[in-house]
């Protein structure tokens, strides 16, 4: 732990906190609107990450009036990485940026041209107008995501899987989220929130060992609450590539502690779904997309689970997944894999539909 000193922050200016991995609750910033990644503490004044597209604009039209939507300053806590629009706020030359860290490392997207510290001394307080702007922007983004999820034209996607997982979490549950689309999807569908501990591997090696980590998290959670009649619930959400990358983690040692209430949800879109919404997934660039980026594998996950002696269930719709998650919560298997057979064909259209509402 390293203390880099104190920064003075005038909260009467339109201020937005962006909290990433390794973030903590910063004294003095409790009442500031916050975009928080899933592994950050749940903020008191949450702002949906898709609202970042609204904050990127200088102002927005509301009836006969224009209101300022761009923050004057952004305070970065920890190391956010998940959303391009959010990162764009940090690099915006019109926004003053302060970065807080408790380690030797700082997130630096402006060649060091940002104020750096660990603690803050605040003056003023957020204005009612700014709080209303942030609430309205966040509500618009939340509704945009929910409207997309309700549109049958997109089929059953990884975002639907994430929504089912987050919607069925309860206070006291623990959730482990894999990298790539999984962690970004749960950020769009609700996480973080109080009462649910969230773990997610990050960085270049984020895909490594996810099943093993999820098992370890489940065992640790039940060890901490060993006096409870039923082991606390742990839910892991993994993409198919992430699941296959550590499939050997399903084999546990004979003398190792066993999970008693672990649900592993595999969002299986048969390949690299995250690339569908990136530049390489554009219609004009798809000639070799499946070979180079989509990389469909056609793996039989049911057969894998049978080989390792793991309980297995397959679902093909949001409703089936909700029912499976609810059933497992009520009568848990020690370890169960729920395979959600999803599509990635509508990924780009899905994100474009959200962007069309928030202006991204």
Go through each PLM region and give its residues:
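Short beta-strand segments
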Residues: 18-20, 76-78, 100-101, 178, ...
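Flexible inter-domain linker/hinge segments
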Residues: 1-4, 149
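Extended, charge-rich low-complexity interaction segments
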Residues: 64-89, 130-151, 290-303, 310
């Amino acid at each position: 732990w390293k203390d880099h000193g104190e920064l003075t922050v005038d909260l009467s200016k339109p201020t937005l906190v962006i909290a990433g991995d390794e973030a903590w609750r910063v004294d003095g910033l409790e009442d500031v609107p916050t975009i928080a990644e899933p592994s950050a503490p749940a903020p008191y004044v949450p702002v949906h990450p898709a609202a970042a597209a609204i904050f990127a604009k200088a102002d927005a039209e509301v009836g006969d009036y224009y209101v300022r939507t761009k923050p004057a300053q952004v305070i970065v806590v920890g190391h956010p990485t998940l959303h391009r629009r959010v990162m764009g706020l940090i690099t915006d030359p019109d926004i003053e940026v302060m970065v807080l860290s408790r380690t030797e490392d700082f997130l630096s997207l402006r060649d060091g041209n940002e104020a750096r510290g660990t603690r803050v001394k605040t003056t003023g307080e957020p204005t009612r107008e700014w709080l209303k702007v942030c609430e309205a922007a966040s509500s618009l983004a939340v509704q945009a995501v929910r409207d997309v999820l309700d549109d049958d034209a997109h089929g059953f996607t990884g975002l639907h899987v994430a929504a089912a997982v987050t919607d069925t979490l309860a206070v006291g549950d623990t959730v482990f989220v894999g990298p790539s689309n999984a962690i970004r999807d749960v950020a769009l569908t609700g996480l973080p929130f109080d009462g649910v501990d969230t773990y997610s591997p990050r960085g270049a090696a984020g895909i490594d060992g996810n099943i093993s980590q999820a098992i370890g998290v489940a065992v640790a959670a039940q060890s901490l609450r060993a006096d409870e009649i039923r082991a606390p619930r742990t839910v892991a959400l993994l993409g198919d590539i992430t699941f296959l990358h550590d499939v050997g983690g399903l084999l546990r040692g004979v003398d190792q502690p066993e999970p008693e209430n672990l649900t592993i949800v595999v969002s299986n879109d048969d390949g690299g779904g995250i690339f569908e919404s990136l530049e390489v997934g554009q219609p004009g660039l798809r000639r070799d997309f499946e070979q180079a980026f989509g990389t469909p594998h056609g793996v039989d996950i049911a057969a894998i689970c049978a080989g390792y002696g793991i309980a297995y269930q397959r679902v093909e719709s949001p409703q089936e997944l909700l029912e499976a998650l609810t059933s497992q919560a009520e009568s848990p298997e020690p370890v169960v894999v729920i395979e959600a057979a999803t599509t990635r064909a509508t990924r780009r259209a899905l994100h474009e539909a959200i962007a069309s509402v928030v202006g991204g």
